[in-house]
Amino acid sequence: DALPMCKGDSFPLDGVLHSVRPMCIGSMPVFVENQREYTIMDTSRFGRVTQVEVGALMVGKICNTPGQGRIRRGEEKGHFAFGGSTIILLLEPGRVQLNSEIFRRTARGQELPVRQGQQIGTAHDEEDMP
């Protein structure tokens, strides 16, 4: 079934391809300099969500599925050529409670691999919102 979500166009941000491994992130501004592409999605449950794909060394290319409109849960939005990389989600304040494991790992400087469909948090119900 279609989710109450609408995907907009994707916008590329040219850049170089540094490694996105944790030891490299502290020594170079990979989230600013690396090739990136972003898409803004309007959702009924999570509000406005911006997904930023960050290219990396040995990945080389971000391939987003073109077009706008309704999307379905699990439907491919795009992929990285030659392997995985990093995805950054920008969420509206107070709309989502992220899983505590994300904060624990981040505090220890550790990565937390996430697979497609894996829950990373829960939406706050409208009555819980600030």
Show where each model-derived region lies.
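Contiguous, well-folded functional domains in the mature portion of proteins
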Residues: 1-130
